[in-house]
From Swiss-Prot:
Region Disordered, residue ranges: 33-57
Organism listed in the record: Shewanella putrefaciens (strain CN-32 / ATCC BAA-453)
Protein name: Cell division protein ZipA
Biased composition annotated in UniProt, kind: Basic and acidic residues: 47-57
Primary site of residence: membrane
Biological process per Gene Ontology, one example term: division septum assembly
Organism placement in taxonomy: Bacteria, Pseudomonadati, Pseudomonadota, Gammaproteobacteria, Alteromonadales
Periplasmic-facing ranges: 1-6
GO-annotated cellular components: cell division site; plasma membrane
TM region positions: 7-27
Keyword Cell cycle: yes
Length: 342
């Protein structure tokens, strides 16, 4: 038994040594041979020496391209007193160009006499008045002052508030300037100034004469939750603004004139965006004043589509200004009112 163990121990040692030798041999075989050990290294070197013939140099040590042998110099050796050799091929007659002669002239100081300022203004009184008038802020009309009765809705109350703000903005007076010219000179320039004013000043709208109202109300036994209304308002490009309600502007980003608005159907008719999750209502009111900015028919079409889209999103119903189901007869009546106030 001991002899068998000894034999197995010797065979295992021989196997381990064989594996190590084979591993070292495999690693050495996979390593790339250097150019010095390669038998073809000298062959390529000899072929390169045969193909490149020795360059011919002249007596000064320059070849046909004017290049001389490389010279090795010590560090710090001065080259100021040495003149580098010049190739005979580069020795050419170079004519020195004459330096341009400039005649220096003495600059004389130029004194500018002060220009007398006129004692009067060339700006006409009409232009001055228009420029000052442009600075006066004017709030755009949002609602109509004469709101038809809408039952229990608060569109009339919101419209009345907007009308009061509009009258307050229009009551601002603009100071006028005393004319500096005589009356004849003023009348001669009036025609040209009127043309300029028409091009630069936007025409204001007349006072609201009518308001178009649409209701989006919850179905019987249900309510509209603020958590659902707020994302729908934002998706329809409404922006929270004046009077604490949402407005649809000319620009989808919320800039420009107001086209139409949304108010709460219940008192006091406002929204609180910070507490919309706890908010609930029976319905909301879409309203648009006439006349309005832009194309009234297009604006009403956008308002109607927005009301229908909101009703589809929150499972509600679209009603007219009298809280009656929206139909073709009501649509034709609204179109007639739009044409009458266009």
């Amino acid at each position: 038994m001991e002899d068998l163990q000894l034999v197995l121990f010797i065979l295992g040692a021989i196997a381990i040594v064989a594996v190590l030798v084979h591993g070292f041999w495999s690693i050495r075989r996979q390593q790339p041979k250097s150019l010095k050990d390669s038998p073809m290294g000298n062959f390529y070197k000899q072929q390169a020496d045969k193909e490149s013939p020795p360059k011919r140099v002249d007596a000064d040590g320059f070849d046909a391209d004017g290049i001389g042998a490389v010279r090795v110099r010590k560090v710090g050796e001065s080259n100021s007193h040495e003149t580098p050799p010049i190739s005979p091929y580069l020795k050419q007659d170079v004519k020195a160009e004459p330096k341009p002669l400039f005649k220096h002239t003495t600059s004389t100081e130029i004194k500018q006499e002060p220009v007398p300022q006129p004692d009067f203004s060339l700006q006409s009184p009409l232009a001055t008045e228009q420029q000052r008038g442009a600075k006066v802020s004017r709030q755009e009309p949002v609602l109509n002052g004469h709101v038809p009765p809408l039952g229990q809705s608060h569109a009339a109350m919101v419209a009345q508030k907007a009308l009061e703000q509009e009258k307050h903005a229009q009551s601002t007076t603009v100071p006028t300037q005393t004319a500096l010219f005589d009356e004849d000179a003023y009348l001669e320039n009036t025609e040209s100034e009127d043309e300029y004013v028409e091009e630069t000043v936007d025409e204001g709208l007349d006072e609201p004469r009518d308001v178009l109202v649409l209701h989006v109300v919850a179905k019987e036994g249900q309510q509209l939750n603020g958590a659902e209304l707020l994302p729908c308002f934002l998706t329809l490009n409404f922006k929270y603004g004046d009077m604490n309600i949402f407005h649809r502007h000319v620009d989808n980003a919320g800039n420009g004139k107001v086209l139409f608005s949304i108010a709460n159907m219940l008192k006091p008719g406002v929204f609180d965006p910070d507490n919309m999750e706890q908010f609930s209502t029976q319905g909301v009111v879409f309203f648009m004043t006439l006349p309005c900015y832009g194309d009234a028919l297009m604006n009403f079409s956008i308002m109607l589509n927005s009301a229908r889209q909101l009703a589809d999103d929150i499972d509600a119903v679209v009603l007219d200004g009298q809280r009656q189901p929206w139909g073709e007869f009501t649509k034709q009546d609204y179109l007639h009112r739009i044409r009458a106030n266009a």
